[in-house]
Curated annotation (Swiss-Prot):
Species the sequence originates in: Paramecium bursaria Chlorella virus 1
Name this protein carries in UniProt: mRNA-capping enzyme
Catalytic activity: a 5'-end diphospho-ribonucleoside in mRNA + GTP + H(+) = a 5'-end (5'-triphosphoguanosine)-ribonucleoside in mRNA + diphosphate
Pfam families the record matches: mRNA_cap_C, mRNA_cap_enzyme
Protein role: mRNA capping. Transfers a GMP cap onto the end of mRNA that terminates with a 5'-diphosphate tail.
Top-level class of the enzyme under EC nomenclature: transferase
Keyword Membrane listed: no
Gene Ontology biological-process annotations: 7-methylguanosine mRNA capping
Active site: 82
Lineage, uppermost ranks: Viruses, Varidnaviria, Bamfordvirae, Nucleocytoviricota, Megaviricetes
Length: 330
């Protein structure tokens, strides 16, 4: 059944949409047609991203390897929990004269997120990096902000992390959640890597609030980098390593993107039948890849480098305790 089309204003066209995460559903309006194209183009322009195709103006982490340990010791890094949610850019802008708060996923799908008390200054153009996740205690959606690209029309992406975070929080100083809001707005807490005991205590608290699947380790001094960032790391427990494959045929053949060949190439097969062209997240168990969930928020498979690095991560099996114990002497 085709969702009904709703006209929310002069020219902004949306469709009703439902996102399901960790068993909880959130009803949103998905922006479609020219309205969607306009918002994506505005974000690309505001972020000053000269990439050929639209993409999220933020970094993609790489899985950490033992060879990266020395880099962590020689540079300043902060750590936080890796929430198991959906990555979005939160984009405040004006469309056809209307002030809108939108969230945009990796597939360039745009949703309206209608908070009630957004400070007007943000609509000069603001791009915040964050994740939609579920507060398992309150059984509500939370949008966790962890970085900023543009704040109230001012580009902050070249600043260090502390300055970007300060600018973002200051711009939201007057914001207050109300019961009608679709999600709770929160900030990610970054902790210096040289404080392993504090990090472990924080992770215990975070695990009691959110579904988490490891760590994010971010450079303090580095600016925002669009695309893959080899100085931004993620660490997942051995049982949580996953790859996003593309279904290459309905019999379950799965593939990755090979940049040298500029096409998807098969690397295995799943049991069962699937929709050709869809993206599926799979975990590795008992020597084979197993289906976990569909990824409608993505429109392309992981590339060969990600695939090969994930296989190395599975082999190295680095644990969170092993990583944090490197800094015990501190």
């Amino acid at each position: 059944m085709v969702p009904p089309t709703i006209n929310t204003g002069k020219n902004i066209t949306t469709e009703r949409a439902v996102l399901t995460l960790n068993g909880l559903q959130i009803k949103l309006h998905k922006v479609v047609g020219e309205s969607r194209d306009d918002i994506v183009a505005k974000m690309k322009d505001l972020a000053m991203d000269d990439h050929k195709f639209p993409r999220l103006p933020g970094p993609n982490p790489v899985s950490i390897e033992r060879k990266d340990f020395e880099k962590l010791k020689q540079n300043k890094y902060v750590v936080s929990e890796k929430t198991d949610g959906i990555r979005f850019m939160m984009f405040f802008t004006r469309v056809f004269g209307f002030k809108v708060c939108t969230i945009i996923d990796r597939a360039m799908t745009v949703y309206l997120l209608p908070f009630k008390n957004i400070p007007r200054v943000l609509f000069q153009g603001s791009i915040f990096d964050g994740e939609l996740c579920v507060d398992i205690v309150e059984k509500k959606f939370a949008f966790v902000l962890f970085d900023a690209v543009v704040v109230s029309g001012v580009t902050v992406s070249q600043m260090d992390l502390a300055s970007r975070f300060f600018a973002m929080k200051r711009s939201l100083k007057e914001f207050k959640n109300v019961p009608e809001d679709p999600a709770i707005l929160r900030y990610k807490e970054w902790i210096p890597l040289e404080h392993p005991t504090i990090i472990k205590d924080h992770l215990k608290k975070a695990n009691a609030i959110y579904h988490t699947d490891g760590l994010i380790i971010m450079s303090v001094d580095e600016p925002v980098i669009y695309g893959r960032n080899f100085n931004l790391f993620k660490l997942k427990p051995g049982t949580h390593h996953t790859i996003d494959f593309i279904i290459m045929s309905e019999d379950g053949t799965i593939g990755i993107f090979d940049p040298n060949l500029r096409k998807n190439v098969p690397v295995g097969k799943l049991d069962g039948y699937y929709n050709k062209g869809s993206i599926v997240e799979c975990g590795f168990a008992d020597g084979t890849w197993k289906y976990i969930q569909g990824r409608s928020d993505k429109n392309q498979a992981n590339d060969r480098l990600t695939y090969e690095k994930t296989l190395l991560n599975i082999e190295e099996n680095i644990t969170i305790d092993e990583l944090l114990d490197l800094f015990k002497w501190e």
